[in-house]
């Protein structure tokens, strides 16, 4: 293979050509996490996984999540241990850009999302954060009218 197709039209899992990007979350309970992303965001569970090491695969809009329990080093990652984050020490988070933040806030809250705060204005956007059962945060944001990136 001399090149990888980046501008593809389909992002199925597993990919038939090119590649698909997924976000991996180390979780305490695979089924609980998969159900949260299904219920709150309308995700589609491709594989439910289990607590014995079989990961769950969830499609949310144009993104894939992989959820799996943590664990110690393995042959393919001999110096790495995976664990759920400490509740208030996060090094990365998922970002969801929406067209109507107030509607998303109300809908997702009614579906069980635990928001840290109500939507707040900041710079050229309105944003808020959801905390999932394992302590991950999910940023939800909407651009202000006339605000553009770049």
What kind of feature is each model-predicted range?
Residues 26, 32-35, 41, 47-49:
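Short, contiguous, helix-prone interaction/anchoring segments in small proteins
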Residues 103, 136:
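Conserved Rossmann-like nucleotide-cofactor binding loop
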Residues 139-141:
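Short C-terminal beta-strand
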